[in-house]
Each structure stands twice: as structure tokens, then as C-alpha cells.
């Protein structure tokens, strides 16, 4: 893969001026700051590609947040032969292997500043920890491969035994602590992982680890709170004003996003985001690559937001501002989808002339020539997150045109609001229900969600 990266950096003009240099390898590729950075870039996307579908099915379908027809993830009947589960496992191990290989190669980088070398090595370790964090939560006991080269040298890579979950968590913690030693504290302007991003992940790992034994470990809770507090107070980051704006491509480098998959649109398959294909209804974009209309948010999730599919759209009151940014429902109109489409007169609100009207998409052929006359949303709603809209929307947000099953919308994995709630939860579990910072964190997150309902600040978290 490194060879492919190196070849991809050669310009067309180079072929006119000199013979093709196609013998890049780990000994000569990492030469200079730019090559080290480019050599790490793909860890933010390609190895994760086959994890995307499992990411939704394990995380959202099995949790009850999403309805997905007859999927075995709906009734917990998955087994070791399930294609998406197998691909999910392969993807996570691939990420771990790539991170380890690049990390070891960077040790021998030449003509490279110590700052950039350390930064890149820290990014490798942070992503390796993230992959193991998904592995242990999904599969439980798993092997630990600390060094690819050592395992290959010993020839024991097919016989490595599984390690108990508690020990996997210790390894993740050790990996993140080393990453934090290497990463800069300065916030990146291009979405790269920094010290506080890794520390935020560490706080989440400790909070999760606290319950692994079956009873809450107070020391782990203290660590979760300690690391979360440092991120909150010293990272210099803040929440986006409006929840829905976090997930727009134009805000991909906002303060709130700590760690995200950073996809690209290009010729290399697996570097792209394809979540819209699985989650959006047919005809949502013009690339013929959407088939997710018959799956969608569950009634349970709708009720958690305080709404019901039985509500009359004309009279529905949304108590939670996050609902519309998560679930499309009858009566909803979006300014950031289909912004090159004229809205029907009945859907024009607050001066909005162009955009996406959920009901008109299904029933109005004058608005959508492919309207089927039937709403596919199985529970009365459709997905919003992980969608970019049509080609015009993608270009407006990200500056490039998407391709078939290929878009560049980042996928946030860890946000500052998560860290706020991690701190609050850790304090509550330790019995500190009136901790000032915990209350402030909780109220900031909930206040944004209920901003238009006159949110009343909590004075206790119980």
C-alpha cells in the first residue's frame, strides 16, 4: 500500500522529465515531513471501509435505534459467518496491522522533523487504540498483536491466543498513553488527531472499562472524569451552536469533532464514504446508488425524541432539536439537502425557496419525477445522519463532486459533547450529583438540544 501511495504522489510532468521511480518501499518512502504525513493519511479511511456497514448494524440496529427488516441484527441471530460481521472483523484487524506497520516504519524516517515524526507516530497509535476499542466491545476477548514484524518473525500469527477483555482494555490504555506522549497539544486545522483527541478517547475507554467486571470500578470512573475534565478545560474547544451543523461537510474541521473518518473521492476504492447508499432512499441522489429507504429509525428512537409517527405534521411539536437532524418525518423540510431544487409553494417556510421536502419527495412528481407515491420509511421516518444530499449539495459543502457509491462526508466517531457527558456520567456514578462542572457540561449539551423550548437548567443530575 505504501508503494501505491508513493506512486500516487508522482505528477504527470515527472514522467516527461525522468524515468518512473516505482521502487518506493518502507526504507525510502518516509523521507521528509510531507511523506510522513501522507503515509499516515490513509489510516483515517481505507482500512476502515469494510467496517462501515457493521458500524451501522451493530451500533444502531442491535441497539434498537434502527429498523432493518429481516436482518439477523434485528433479532440477535447473527453468527460467525455473517458477511458484514466478518468484514467488520477483517477491517478492524487491517487497521491494526496498517497502524503497526506504519508506526514501525516511521521510526526510521529520514530528513524529518522530530515534531512531525512524533505526531504521525502518535496518530498511528491513536487509530490502533480506536480499532481495538471497537474490537473488544464487539467481539469480547481478542488476541493482541503488538508488532506485526515480531509476529511474522516468530511465525506465530496464526496461533496467537485470545486475551481477556480486561487485559485488552489495559492494552488500549497503554497505547493511548503512548500516543499522548507523542501527539501535539495544538489543535489541527485539518482534522488530524491531537493530544486532546486521544485523551478524550482515553476518557471514554476508562468509562467503558469501569463496568467490564460487572460492578463499577471507582478508580476507572475517577480516571474517566480526570481525563475528560482536562479535555474540557484545556483543549480550547467548544460545542457547535446548532446540533445539525456538526454533520455538514463544511464544518468537518469544527472544534466539536475530535476523531472522525476522513474520506476522499478518488480512483482508489475503499478511500470513500458509502454510508449514504445504505441509509438513503432510492432517488435521493442522482448517482443511482441509494437503496436504504426500507430501513430507518425505529419507533423507539422517535419516542425517545418525544415524537410519534402518528403525530399530525401540522401540529407536531418537537421538544428535542436533535430529532430533525436524526430522523426525517412528514412535514420536514431541509435547507441543506436538495438545495438546487425549487420547493413546492406549500413547503416554503421562513423564506426558504429551495431544499428537500420529505413528503413531496415521495408523493409529488412535479417536485421529484421519481416519486413513488409510497413512503418507504418503515416506521414513519427516514435517516438523516451520514447523508450529504445530491451532487450539488456535496459540491457546496465539500468543494468536489461525488461519484457512484463514493462521497467525502466525514464520519464523526468522537465529539466534544461525548466528553461532556462522559464527565457528567462518571461523576454521577461516583455519587457526585451536584458537581458544578458536571452540571455545566450536562446543561450545555441538553440546552442545545432543547434550545427552542426554553430549557431549564438542571441543578442535580439525579
Residue positions per predicted region:
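C-terminal substrate/ligand-recognition segments
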Residues: 327-445
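C-terminal motif of bacterial Sec signal peptides marking the signal peptidase cleavage site
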Residues: 9-11
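An aromatic- and glycine-enriched ligand-binding surface/loop that stacks and positions planar moieties
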Residues: 13-69, 146, 169, 177-178, ...
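Short coil/turn linking the two alpha-helices of tandem helical-hairpin repeats
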Residues: 136-138, 143, 187, 208-217, ...
Amino acid at each position: 500500500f505504501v508503494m501505491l501511495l508513493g506512486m500516487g504522489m508522482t505528477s504527470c510532468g515527472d514522467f516527461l522529465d525522468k524515468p518512473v521511480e516505482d521502487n518506493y518501499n518502507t526504507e525510502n518512502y518516509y523521507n521528509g515531513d510531507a511523506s510522513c504525513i501522507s503515509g499516515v493519511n490513509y489510516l483515517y479511511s481505507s482500512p476502515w471501509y469494510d467496517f462501515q456497514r457493521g458500524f451501522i448494524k451493530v451500533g444502531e440496529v442491535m441497539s434498537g435505534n434502527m429498523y432493518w427488516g429481516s436482518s439477523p441484527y434485528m433479532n440477535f441471530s447473527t453468527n460467525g459467518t455473517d458477511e458484514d460481521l466478518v468484514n467488520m472483523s477483517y477491517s478492524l484487524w487491517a487497521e491494526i496491522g496498517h497502524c503497526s506497520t506504519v508506526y514501525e516504519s516511521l521510526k526510521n524516517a529520514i530528513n524529518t522533523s522530530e515534531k512531525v515524526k512524533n505526531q504521525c507516530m502518535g496518530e498511528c497509535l491513536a487509530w490502533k487504540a480506536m480499532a481495538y476499542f471497537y474490537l473488544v466491545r464487539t467481539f469480547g476477548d481478542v488476541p493482541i498483536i503488538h508488532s506485526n514484524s515480531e509476529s511474522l518473525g516468530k511465525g506465530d500469527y496464526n496461533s496467537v491466543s485470545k486475551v481477556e477483555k480486561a487485559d485488552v482494555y489495559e492494552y488500549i490504555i497503554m497505547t493511548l498513553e503512548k500516543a499522548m506522549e507523542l501527539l501535539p497539544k495544538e489543535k489541527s486545522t485539518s482534522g488530524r488527531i491531537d493530544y486532546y483527541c486521544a485523551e478524550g478517547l482515553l476518557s471514554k475507554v476508562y468509562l467503558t472499562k469501569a463496568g467490564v467486571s460487572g460492578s463499577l470500578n471507582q478508580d476507572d470512573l475517577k480516571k474517566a472524569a480526570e481525563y475528560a475534565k482536562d479535555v474540557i478545560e484545556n483543549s480550547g474547544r467548544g460545542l457547535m451552536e446548532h446540533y445539525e451543523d456538526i454533520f455538514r461537510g463544511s464544518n468537518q474541521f469544527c472544534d466539536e469533532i475530535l476523531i472522525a473518518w476522513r474520506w476522499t473521492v478518488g480512483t482508489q476504492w475503499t478511500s470513500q464514504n458509502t454510508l449514504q447508499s445504505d441509509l438513503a432512499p432510492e432517488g435521493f441522489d442522482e448517482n443511482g446508488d441509494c437503496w436504504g429507504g426500507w430501513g430507518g429509525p425505529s419507533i423507539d428512537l422517535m419516542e425517545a425524541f418525544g415524537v410519534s409517527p402518528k403525530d399530525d405534521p401540522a401540529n407536531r411539536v418537537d421538544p428535542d432539536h436533535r430529532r430533525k437532524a436524526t430522523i426525517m418525518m412528514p412535514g420536514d423540510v431541509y435547507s441543506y439537502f436538495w438545495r438546487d431544487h425549487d420547493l413546492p409553494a406549500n413547503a416554503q417556510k421562513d423564506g426558504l425557496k429551495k431544499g428537500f421536502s420529505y413528503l413531496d419527495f415521495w408523493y409529488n412528481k412535479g417536485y421529484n419525477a421519481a416519486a413513488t407515491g409510497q413512503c418507504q420509511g418503515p416506521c414513519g421516518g427516514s435517516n438523516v445522519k451520514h447523508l450529504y444530499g445530491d451532487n450539488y449539495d456535496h459540491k457546496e459543502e465539500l468543494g468536489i463532486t461525488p461519484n457512484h457509491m463514493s462521497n467525502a462526508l466525514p464520519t464523526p466517531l468522537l465529539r466534544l459533547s461525548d466528553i461532556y457527558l462522559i464527565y457528567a456520567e462518571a461523576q454521577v456514578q461516583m455519587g457526585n450529583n451536584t458537581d458544578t462542572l458536571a452540571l455545566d457540561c450536562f446543561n450545555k449539551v441538553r440546552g442545545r438540544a432543547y434550545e427552542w423550548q426554553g430549557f431549564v437548567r438542571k441543578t442535580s443530575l439525579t
